[in-house]
A protein has these predicted regions:
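Periplasmic-side early beta-strands and strand-to-turn transitions of outer-membrane beta-barrels
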Residues: 139, 151, 158-160, 164-166, ...
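Gram-negative outer-membrane beta-barrel transporters
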Residues: 332, 372-379, 464-466, 483-561, ...
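Structural signature of Gram-negative outer-membrane beta-barrels, strongest in the C-terminal barrel
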Residues: 234, 286, 332-336, 340-344, ...
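Non-catalytic regulatory/gating segments with a bias toward low-complexity or hydrophobic composition
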Residues: 57, 69, 130-131, 150-152, ...
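N-terminal periplasmic "start-of-domain" segments of outer-membrane beta-barrel proteins
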Residues: 27-60, 88
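Extracytoplasmic beta-strand/coil segments of soluble accessory domains associated
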Residues: 66, 70-106, 110
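Outer-membrane beta-barrel signature, preferentially recognizing the C-terminal barrel domain
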Residues: 25, 258-277, 315-318, 390, ...
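Short acidic/polar hinge/loop motifs at secondary-structure boundaries
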Residues: 107-134
Length: 627
């Protein structure tokens, strides 16, 4: 599908005039849609932006969304084991629930239930590109966009057919196929499907998370299907419809319920999404209207009794979204505005909502964004008001200014507010819910420089984020939630990219001081320092790559040891680690490419969640056929 945010050639020409010269003069000024909900060149966006293409995903030979995101600036990924195990994404030191995860511009369903998005359940075979914006974006998108926005796009961008087959360590095997074909001059049909299975490994071998030791393999299986059709009615109107879904089964290590003789260590997730829309594009004006529906069923159960058996747990959620957006070119910039409506609902039969008085909430948001250029200065501003069916109106705003003070060098500064709405669980569940909760709020300052020095294109950013009204539960029964927490996060980020001879270098460094605003303790599972480096080069027809990732020291809790002195679980420290991956690819023919990868080359033993192992050294071999 073409983007519902599409602009005309005239519109893109205006934004090209606004583009930062250091970036605009390159051959890779990519077009994105996620920063302000319309198409614009990356170089015209004042916030730090990273775009990951399908070609890069294939080059890195990643096998999960988590593996892709861990390479990006400002991202920490904590995962309770290997592929398919529960994962959390931290951006710029904010909590996982403060990162907005979108799939094709629509908020991931489960975020409205648990508060954060578990990216381990999204099949990478569906992902065609990822747009990642750092900093506050609630003034554009509403709730969740505190630390940043990650938009996962599933649309195949080229005609043709691709077949892939991969085998690897721990019994890993994956098969996927995708095709895009034209029917006549105005209709395009796209289809994709995949199957993934891995035996996995014992993610909790030491039994030191408070549960019963389970010496077993914790495997994962995924099946996914994607179908879409787009039709160009005339030169101005496009319509599209699509449907996609996936089924996942995950084995994990769990706590034993001795009273009921239940060990619920298997997760089965079903997700179905249907959406459609229409877009209009003429001259300086464009508009879109779309509707999306998602139903997700998430079971946790003891395989001895079956998915619907004794003491099984079900989270059954429904999400609907309607979006209407408009964009018009004005002077040396543009103005955009729109309305979106969403409903999140917990369906009958869900385990944690048996005593709830209410099982849904609605949210309506109205937003306005603008960007203008005046010589070497670009200014942008956004404002948005959200009406929540429970707590009423909440307004956020942000502004950024960039000044190109010398050819190829720009200084940027900005301020923004953001918020996170209470989730369905926090408001209405049978345990600890509080219908009087207010949104968590954030105030953020950011400043930096970017430029091009010789072959190096770089950006240096410093930021501060004060978060208040954090929702926390009582430490004793009835464990009710209240707005009592605070956090202060300060950080510095440097990113760079350059070519030398046959080598292409991409690297980032981040320093984060993320602390509890009241106790001043460091926030858990966030590394103080990270260094990420990607080296790619070609020799003859070989395409070679080296990935280096240094993850600094982090804190966590030992949930197997309760310390009465602090009335909580024992704090622990996890040391830093250096990780290397190597990749190679060779085109056997014009259609067939063979790829190989060694992950964690030096077989480092480390954890991103205390008590849960990582995979160790792994080997993968892929065959890819295009026609």
């Amino acid at each position: 599908m073409t983007s519902p945010y599409a602009l005309s050639v005239v519109g893109l020409a205006v934004f090209s005039a606004l583009s930062f010269s250091a970036s605009a003069n390159t051959n890779d000024d990519q077009i994105i849609v996620s920063a302000n909900r319309f198409q614009q060149p990356v170089s015209s966006v004042l916030a730090p932006v990273t775009v990951v293409t399908r070609e890069e995903i294939d080059k890195w030979q990643s096998n999960s969304v988590a593996d892709v995101l861990r390479r990006l600036p400002g991202v920490d990924v904590a995962q309770s084991g290997g592929i398919g195990q529960t994962s959390s994404v931290f951006v710029r030191g904010t909590d996982a629930r403060h990162v907005m995860i979108l799939v094709d511009g629509v908020r991931l369903n489960q975020a409205n239930v648990s508060g954060s998005s578990d990216i381990s359940q999204i099949p990478l075979s569906m992902v065609q590109s990822i747009e990642y914006i750092r900093g506050p974006r609630s003034a554009v998108y509403g709730s969740d966009a505190v630390g940043g926005v990650i938009n996962i796009l599933t649309e195949r961008k080229t005609e043709g057919t691709t077949l892939n087959a991969t085998m690897g360590s721990h019994g890993y095997q994956e098969y996927d196929a995708s095709t895009q074909q034209k029917i006549g001059d105005r209709t395009t049909i796209t289809a994709a499907g995949s199957y993934l299975y891995t035996k996995g490994f014992d993610v909790e071998a030491n039994g030191n998370t408070g549960g019963v030791r389970q010496p077993d393999r914790d495997g994962f299986m995924n099946k996914s299907l994607w179908l879409g059709v787009k039709h160009q009615i005339n030169d101005n109107f496009d319509v599209y419809a699509r449907a996609y879904g996936f089924d996942n089964r995950t084995a994990y290590d769990a706590f034993y319920d001795s009273y009921n003789d239940v060990l619920a260590d298997t997760r089965q997730l079903y997700s179905r999404t249907y959406d459609g829309g229409i877009s209009y594009n003429r001259g300086i004006y464009s508009s879109f209207l779309n509707y999306s529906y998602n139903r997700t069923k998430d079971y946790n159960y003891d395989p001895r009794y079956g998915q619907y058996g004794k003491e099984h747990r079900l989270t059954d959620t429904e999400q609907q979204n309607v979006q209407w957006g408009n964009h018009v070119q004005v002077g040396n910039g543009s103005v955009s505005g729109g309305v979106d409506w969403s409903r999140q609902k917990m369906m009958d039969g869900s385990s944690d909502f048996t005593t709830a008085d209410k099982n849904y909430f609605d949210n309506t948001g109205v937003y306005l964004t603008g960007q203008q250029g005046l010589g070497p200065v670009i200014a942008e501003a956004s404002i948005r008001s959200d009406h929540h069916s429970d707590y009423g109106w909440h307004t956020t705003w942000q502004t950024n200014v960039g000044w190109e003070f010398a050819d190829g060098y720009r200084v940027i500064g900005g301020y923004g507010t953001a918020f996170k709405a209470p989730t369905l669980n926090q408001l209405y569940s049978a345990w600890g819910s509080n219908p009087n909760l207010k949104p968590e709020t954030s105030k953020q300052w950011e400043g930096g420089f970017e430029g091009i020095t010789g072959p190096l294109e770089w950006r240096l950013t410093t930021y501060r984020n004060d978060i208040e009204e954090l929702i926390q539960s009582e430490s004793s029964y009835p464990y009710q939630n209240y707005n009592v927490g605070e956090a202060r996060i300060e950080g510095v980020e440097f990113t760079g990219e350059m070519d030398t001879w046959i080598f292409h270098h991409t690297f980032s460094y981040q320093y984060i001081d993320a602390r509890n605003g009241k106790t001043h303790e460091r926030l858990e599972r966030r590394a103080r320092q990270q260094l990420k480096y990607q080296l790619d080069w070609n020799i003859e027809e070989w395409d070679l790559g080296l990935t280096y990732n240094y993850i600094g020291q982090r804190t966590d809790k030992d949930y197997g040891t309760f310390d009465p002195a602090i009335n909580g679980y024992k704090p622990v420290s996890m040391g830093g680690v250096s990780l290397f991956d190597v990749t190679a690819a060779y085109p056997v023919t014009d259609h067939l490419t063979i790829r190989g990868k060694v992950a964690n080359l030096f077989d480092k033993d480390y954890e991103t969640v205390y008590g849960y192992r990582t995979a160790g050294r792994e080997y993968f071999l892929t065959g890819s056929y295009n026609f």
